[in-house]
Design a protein with these regions (language model features):
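Catalytic pocket-lining loop regions of alpha/beta-barrel enzymes
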Residues: 133-135, 145-253
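Mid-to-C-terminal alpha-helical segments outside catalytic/metal-binding sites
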Residues: 2-18, 22-69, 74, 247-253, ...
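Active-site gating/metal-coordination segments in enzymes
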Residues: 73-175
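Short, flexible/disordered intra-domain loops and linkers
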Residues: 48-52, 84-89, 175-185, 262-270
């Protein structure tokens, strides 16, 4: 049991973290070529104009040490929206090992690809739940090559409601800057999903591409939550106030997108503490930093 698990000083759950096995970390570009994941490679292995990598590739030990430095009690490991169904299984098995080894610090979601078909996809979800994974995502139908009304995805989202498993979806702001690997994700699709599956809890990543600011209908859909992942790369610090003006704090969930370096102008290494400080300075309280995530996982 970690010495930090009962610490009253630790009041943060980071609900948007990615982690990979050592075989990927050793040579991410070569791994992506071998596994047929060019979109992930375009997003995650490139360098910025100054030559600094867009993200790091820590192992689980490095992640835990960064959590300790930042005062993060628990991290939610999100899967990636892989192009290959086999890669989803590979990451799910890895996450199962992580949460069994560190149940007091790590929570994990399962990722899936409906292109695998009905029985393989649902069978994988059953296996992932048996291994201790508690949510589904990060998914991106638009990046993975299937429709939001895909029959297998519909079954997945119905099962998520039955099992009370939250679903994290990648969202791109339609007005955001262009970057390598950027994929359009029409905001109307997320409204449709929330209305079609009212018992499924969806977390829309990256502030949901500003969905509740541009579509008042979304504000009334209580099964839509919004995480703050990669916030400094996309928006200014005023984003916190803009969201709190239209949504209650119970629908905003803190997430960093670690190990993405969200403050590249301040140094080459990804870390969690600066975004936590930004959130607190903007008035984010326990609801956003801790309690909302806990409620998602309460069945």
């Amino acid at each position: 049991m970690s010495e930090f698990s009962n610490s009253r000083a630790m009041k943060v759950i980071d609900s948007h973290v990615h982690l990979y096995p050592s075989e990927l970390n050793a040579d991410p570009a070569a791994w992506a070529l071998k596994w047929g994941e060019p979109h992930w490679a375009k997003l995650c292995t490139r360098k910025r104009e100054d030559g600094v990598p867009v993200q790091g590739f820590p192992d689980v030990g490095e992640l835990l040490r960064e959590m300790d430095r930042a005062g993060v009690e628990r991290a939610v490991l999100l899967g990636w929206y892989w192009e290959q169904a086999e890669t989803c299984l590979w990451q799910n098995r890895f996450y199962g090992k992580c949460v069994r080894a560190h149940p007091d610090r790590l929570i994990a979601y399962a990722t899936i690809h409906p292109g695998a078909g009905h029985w393989p996809t649902l069978g994988e979800l059953h296996r992932a739940r048996d291994e201790g994974l508690v949510g589904i995502g990060e998914l991106s139908p638009h990046s993975q090559g299937y429709r939001v009304d895909d029959p297998v995805l519909r079954e997945v989202l119905t099962l998520a409601a039955d099992w009370k498993m939250p679903v994290n979806l990648h969202v791109t702001d339609p007005a955001s800057r262009r970057y390598p690997g950027r994929v359009e994700t029409p905001l109307a699709d997320f409204v449709w999903l929330a209305k079609t599956f009212p018992k499924t809890k969806f977390t829309l990543a990256h502030w949901g591409g500003l969905l509740p600011l541009v579509d008042p209908e979304a504000r009334d859909l209580e099964n839509l939550f919004y995480d703050t992942a990669a916030s400094p790369l996309i928006y200014g610090t005023d984003i916190w106030g803009r969201f709190s003006a239209v949504l209650p704090p119970e629908r905003i969930i803190f997430g960093s997108d670690y190990p993405l370096n969200v403050y590249p102008q301040l140094g080459p290494a990804p870390e969690m503490s600066r975004l936590i400080a930004e959130a607190r300075a903007a008035g984010a309280g326990e609801a956003t930093l801790l309690e909302n995530a806990l409620r998602l996982f309460t069945r």
